[in-house]
Amino acid sequence: MSTALNARRPAPAPPATKAAPAAPAPKGLLPVVLTATFMTALDIFVVNVALPSLQADLGAGPAAVQWVMAGFSLALAAGLVTAGRLGDRYGRRRVFALGLALFTLASAGCGFAPSAGTLVGARVVQGLAAALMGPQVLAILRTAFSGAAQARAFARYGLTMGVGAVFGQLIGGLLIRADLLGLGWRSCFLINLPIGLAALVMVRRCLPESRSPQRPGLDPVGVLLVSTALTALVLPLIQGPRLGWPLWTVLCLGASLALLAAFAVHQHRSTPTDTAPTGSTPTGTTGPATGTTGATGATGTTAGATGAATGTPLVDTRLFRDRAFSAGVLAQLAFWLGQGSFFLVLALHLQFGRGLDALGAGLVFTAIGLGYLITSNTTHRVTARLGVRRTITVGGLLMAAGLALLALAAYEVSDGSVWWLAPGLFVDGLGMGLVIAPVTAVVLAGVEPRLAGSAAGVVSTVQQVGGALGIALIGLLYYGAGDPTAAFGHSVLALAVLELVLVALVRLLPRTS
């Protein structure tokens, strides 16, 4: 067995062609990229509690309110894969800074929007800006850190994502209740201005430039196919539940599958046929000084290939030959199928099922936050002791147990107190803290630095598509139940099953992950 596994691994690269060990990352690098991560996570989830206020203030109808959420998600999902390639080609710091500046500007547009239409347009720009930043953050963490430092960096990334997601609800509730300067819901967007401007000042000082030495092409056919496919996939998933799944949503879903298949075929044909997608750099890949390809000079085509490529693929399909990458992507999909819908279902249950205001709902979310902070801050040490597979397994089982406790509280507790939900939320938070960082790090840990942007784009896209798909599927269950209490109970039970699916998929990861 060991011999067979070793035979599938690429031979180590000669010392001259290995990527040189990265210099110690500047001290301010991690805070800068994690600030952008926090801003994005906060902006996604703070809107959950701001919707009723902005709807009343702008006189927005249900369709406009839906597009405040949908416009951001659609632009984000459609742009992630392409943004990963832009970072590889033009420089991750440059693309990250562009995304950060655009996100800050769009936040001002949201905060000062005079109408629902203007707000939706600004949210679309926010989504595009978040798409520019997301893959660069993951690629920078992959290329700037190694070994134990990389594990700690991804643990901080997971901590930041969770804090933004969990406490975003509370921060939004506090801002709306405080009504600073009479801004109300607008402060939920305007809070990004000082944070974004401070981060922009730090980018030049703390963030070194990095890019693929091969300056890969943009693959315009691939960009068109994947952007159209993801738009056709995510749009009906967002609009379908509200509209009752009219014919056009079904046709869009069918078209998205066909377009994704065409994209996969195009990427496979464009990918060189050498067998070293991850781990070490294949022989002749990168000249140590010039960054040109060893076999083809400066053409930008991957070197060392034994077969001709028809172009530069947007996603190098050799990535999926690596078991850790492909199994990790599946685990990511299962995780975000559940988490993408859980926060929305809980917010709906608290505000419409239990009648809480934005601040009250945000306070309930602190139970998840406390559990999450306890485990996510020590995930790298737990992973070092247990390994990735066992850590994610323990986390998935804790999440399933927490969700089962929530279902029990929904079905059996009749006094109406929301604090009966606290034990289940706390246990779910403990599990979530053990999953987010390892399930992200395991996908990217073995990826070559030259492919970091492309791989990060895939991971970020899976997160967004998984979340949209989860919202659509769990939304059918939630809105189909009728009674709010039963709807919540049925939904969290289904989510518990999804966490068990995650635990099963983790078994596909290599034992040495």
Predicted regions and their residues:
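Interfacial helix-cap and linker-helix signal at transmembrane-aqueous boundaries
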Residues: L54-Q55, L86-G87, I171-L180, L237, ...
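Alpha-helical transmembrane segments of multi-pass secondary-active solute transporters
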Residues: V65-Q66, V95, A153, S187-I191, ...
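A residue-level signal for alpha-helical anchor/packing sites in multi-pass solute transporters
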Residues: I140, L174, M202, A232-L235, ...
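Helix-loop interface residues and adjacent transmembrane-helix termini in multi-pass membrane transporters
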Residues: G59, R89, F112-A113, A144-G147, ...
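Transmembrane-helix bundle of Major Facilitator Superfamily
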Residues: S2-P12, A19-L200, T378-T379, A404-A407, ...
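Transmembrane-helix exit segments and adjacent C-terminal regions of multi-pass membrane proteins
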Residues: S2-L29, G244-P246, G284, G291-G300, ...
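12-transmembrane solute porter fold
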Residues: P26-V49, D274, G307-S513
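Hydrophobic transmembrane-helix bundles of small-molecule transporters
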Residues: A178-Q332, G338, L356, V364, ...
